Structure formats: structure tokens, C-alpha cells
Amino acid sequence: MRYLKTPHFIHTALPLVVTGFLIAGVADARTISYATGYPPQSIGAEAGKAFADAMEDYSDGELMVKVYPQSLLSFSETPSGVRDGMADSGLVLTPYFPSEFPSTNLAAEISMLLELTDAPAETAGLAYAGAMSEYLFNHCPECSGEFEAQNQVFIGGGGTSPYMLLCNTPVRNLEELEGKRVRIGGAQWSRWAEDLGASPVSVPQHETYEALSQGVVDCTIHSAPELTIVKLMEVVSDITTGAPGGVFAGVGNTVNRDTWRNLDEQQRSSVLHASAVLSAELSWGYAEAAVENMKTAERLERIDIHDASDEMKVRTREFIREDLDNMASTYSEKYGVNGADEMIETFKPILEKWVSLVDGVESGEALAELYWKEVFSKVDVSGHGL
């Protein structure tokens, strides 16, 4: 992955019945409830608003969306809540549920593959989100089956900006990483930390601020937007880019399967079109926040920004290659995923393609159009999820 010195871009019991009501000029409009664990005014909540606006637009007012940010369902409640009809639609973080979404999580967990490509850090999450959506829609019937088993239909993904080391002490090379207590947010980063001599520590995201400020951990592996989302900018003294890399892409925008079946084909197409907007706005929001936060950190004298040493980058790439082989057997043995190695090989060229496709994208609107043109518009709404 290339880390550009200059930003690539910068611009300021039964399912809920899809409720009918009248709008001026539009009869029989329907409202879809959408739950997200993101708090109001966050990147995720704003993406939810974009989803609602796009739904009304693309359906010519036939479908409306009521967004419930961090109120109707938490992230931990969303899969069961959408399954049981507490919400018609919601944002599911699949890594939180390893037994329910193993095939999906396999694709999400290999995101450190980005470090073996020429993807700029600024567009890495955009590429991975596109690749995940294409893979789940077109190449992973097992993934679709996992959502359907939860009475849900997958309608899109998303991706964060790259993960890096946010620390309270300089960690620029393997020697400085040795023995450090590192808060991790995913299995792949835990394995990376352990392999490179650090001690992975499991800390809930909302407790990361306190853990860093009190020295419970020396570093956390997070993306740059968390500098403001979790206010880590206040307690971090050193940021190291270039390692470990990878993005969080275990994001599934879903709709209750019974709700989906109650829509006609044109309405399903409108839902997918709006979901392409949500995927783009979520991924773009993280990418843009990462650029802004890194620029802010550069201006603060109390924060030093480092690039990982060449030795650390080389060792990271070695780890990624080794881990890919081990991951296939792990998912097969632990979760019963058949053909895990073939799944990984299928995903690789899709990711490479998307690294190129997002190159030069300069707005969330352009990204949404790209997602729609390349993937979402090609989904067979007469069969998908039914």
C-alpha cells in the first residue's frame, strides 16, 4: 500500500410492517425503519441520512426511510433485531458474530491484503468496500446464505481508512514494538501484534481512551478517524503509519428478508441504489475524516507522526502472506468453511480491480455512482435474497 504525502482528495416477532401513509402528491408511500449503532452526527449516522435521502429520490417518493441512530438497536443487537423485525433494515458488523457470518468474515478479515497492493492509503477503504460488495453479491453464495439464515438480505458493505498504530510512546520499528501492550480490534491485528513481538490486549473501543491515558496499553490499532470519534487525539503522543495496515470491512447493510419480499422489483432496485449511496458515504466519510485528522495531528506539537521502518513493513508483508495460508485452514477447522483457500484466491483479483477503479474518485457522489454502475445495478432483484 502506498501512503501518499499529499492527500489524494480533500473536500471540505413479525417483521415490522413497511408502513403506508400519504405524502403530498404521492399515494401509498412506505416507510422503512433503519437502525444503526452509530451515534447521531457521526460518520455512520450521516451515511444513514444519505441512505434515506437517496431512497426517497430513487423511488420517486414511494419508499421513505426513518433512521434510528444508536437508539432502536445497538451494534450488538442489530442482527437479531433486523432478523426479528424490530427494524426493517440495519447496519450489521459481522465480525462481532463469528459463528453466524464465517464466510463473510473470512473476506473481511483478509483486508491486510491491501498492504500487498499499490493502493494509496487514502483510497484503500473505498477499494475494499467495493470489492467486498462485489464478492458478496456475485461470488459468495455461502455469504448470502449466512444472511438469509438470519432472515436478512445483504444489500451493501463499507470500509474504514487503514489501521495504524496510535500510541503514547514512539513505536517506529520492531525494537520499539517489542513487548508493547497493543489494544487490538480484530483477530488479524492480534495475530500481527503477537507475531511481531507485541502483546495484544482486548479493550472495548469506548474504554480505549482511558486505557491509553492511564498506561494500561501503550498503543491501539485504529484508523485515523478514531482520533476524533473516540477522542484519542487527546491522549495519543505518537502515530505510526504504514503498519499494520488493513481496514475494517466487516460491514453489512441488511434488510429484513420478509420486508424485502414485500417489495416489488422496482422498489428492490431503489433500495439497492440507495444502499450504494450509503456504502459510498460511509466509506468516503472515513476516508475524508482520516485525511482531516492526520492534518490536525500534524499541526499539534505534542503529537509526532512517524512512518513505520522498512524492516517493520517487510516483516508485516511476510506476516500477511503466512497468515493467509493459516487463515484458510483456521476457518475450515474452526467454522467449517469449505473451500476457504479458493475463496481467498477468488477475492484477490477482485480487490486488485477495485484498487484501480477507485483511483481518481474525488467525491462521495462519484464513488456512489461507481459502486452502482459496477456492482449494485447488476444485482438480479428477481432472485437476490428470495
Language model segments and positions:
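Short, solvent-exposed loop/beta-turn-alpha elements that line the ligand-binding surface or hinge
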Residues: 114-149
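Bacterial N-terminal signal peptides that target proteins for export
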Residues: 2-16
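Sec/Tat signal peptide C-region and signal peptidase I cleavage site
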Residues: 22-29
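Intrinsic disorder/low-complexity signature
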Residues: 5-8, 25, 93
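N-terminal secretory/targeting leader peptides
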Residues: 30-123, 150-386
